[in-house]
Amino acid sequence: GWFDVVKHIASAV
């Protein structure tokens, strides 16, 4: 889902 994308971005930051 889109939340997985959000967590991915959060981890990248």
UniProtKB/Swiss-Prot annotation:
Name listed for the protein in its UniProt record: Uperin-7.1
Organism: Litoria ewingii
Modified sites of kind Valine amide: 13
Organism lineage: Eukaryota, Metazoa, Chordata, Craniata, Vertebrata
Gene Ontology CC: one annotated term: extracellular region
Tissue: Expressed by the skin dorsal glands.
Subcellular location: Secreted
Domain of life of the native organism: Eukaryota
Annotated function: Uperin 7.1 shows antibacterial activity against L.lactis and S.uberis. Uperin 7.1.1 is inactive.
Single GO BP term: defense response to bacterium
Keyword GTP-binding listed: no
Keyword entries, A-Z: Amidation, Amphibian defense peptide, Antibiotic, Antimicrobial, Secreted
